[in-house]
Regions:
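Extracellular structured ligand-interaction cores
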Residues: 115, 124, 143
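A glycine-anchored, Pro-Gly-centered beta-turn/N-cap motif
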Residues: 120-128
Length: 168
């Protein structure tokens, strides 16, 4: 496992994105306060960032606490792990650093505010997203596992982001 992030969401979604790759659809610059989420949902820029491997959204979440785990060329241990859904494959092209953030950062852009570096090395990856319950005794932890497999080129994405990725 590359990294585990505990998060408390405020904005009904998570975004995994490449920086500086995310700047490309905006001519190389995003102004502080700009609402790029609206651009992605009302123009073809949303499809562009998915197809070019710039971003991967996890949408339709309830506010609250989640664990997000990043696996690189390895798979999660299935002991005490119940898979709720699997979406594959997305592609991510990490040209700089890969960041995790609450979707709110795309609502009101500010460089590096609320971003967490996922510590995934540069490269092209096909990514499987799994929504899972981690069972710890009587407790259920709501988790998203991103399983990265290194590849030589971007593939054709044959999955759409879910509008409802809730695990409750």
């Amino acid at each position: 496992m590359v990294k585990t992030i505990d998060t408390d969401l405020d904005f009904n979604g998570i975004i995994i994105f490449d920086y500086p790759g995310i700047l490309a659809p905006f001519g190389g610059k995003i102004d502080d306060g700009e609402n790029i989420l609206e651009e992605f949902t009302t123009t073809d820029k949303g499809e562009l960032v998915l197809n070019e491997g710039i971003a991967l959204p996890i949408m339709g979440l309830d506010d609250g606490g989640y664990v997000v785990r990043f696996f690189l060329n390895e798979f999660p241990d299935n002991e005490d792990r119940e898979v709720i859904f699997t979406d594959k494959y997305f592609y991510l092209n990490v040209t700089g650093d890969l960041y995790f953030a609450d979707m709110a950062v795309f609502w009101e852009w500010e460089d590096y505010t609320g971003w967490v570096n996922a510590d995934v090395p540069k490269g092209i990856y096909k990514v499987s997203l799994e929504g899972v319950h981690l069972l710890k005794g009587e407790e259920t932890i709501y988790c998203y596992d991103l399983i990265f497999e290194k590849t030589n080129q971007l593939g054709t994405r044959d999955v759409e982001p879910r509008s409802d990725s809730r695990l409750y």
